[in-house]
From Swiss-Prot:
Keyword field: Metal-binding, Metal-thiolate cluster
InterPro entries: Metalthion_15p
N-terminal signal peptide: none
Protein name, per record: Metallothionein-like protein type 2
Record bears the keyword Heme: no
GO function term, MF aspect, one: metal ion binding
Function: Metallothioneins have a high content of cysteine residues that bind various heavy metals.
Family from the record: Belongs to the metallothionein superfamily. Type 15 family.
Keyword Metal-binding belongs to the record: yes
Length: 80
């Protein structure tokens, strides 16, 4: 399992990819220098909090104004 859970992420130059290569949705939880062969991940789930001022574009990752749509294509490609 990738650290982004297989979710699409936007990288530099408005190139989309899978896993850790873009939005960094989940931090790298591995530690270097250890010789363990297994890792334990604990993820919690909480209800989303929304307010009337929330920006539109739900469900997309954003990186430098580059948005990645659900089909793993940049939408729109406006990286600066």
């Amino acid at each position: 399992m990738s650290c982004c859970g297989g979710n699409c992420g936007c990288g530099s130059g408005c190139k989309c990819g899978n896993g850790c290569g873009g939005c960094k949705m989940y931090p790298d939880l591995g530690f270097s220098g250890e010789s363990t062969t297994t890792e334990t991940f604990v993820f919690g789930v909480a209800p989303a909090m929304k307010n009337q001022y929330e920006a539109s574009g739900e469900g997309v990752a954003e990186n430098d104004a580059c948005k990645c749509g659900s089909d793993c294509k940049c939408d729109p490609c406006t990286c600066k």
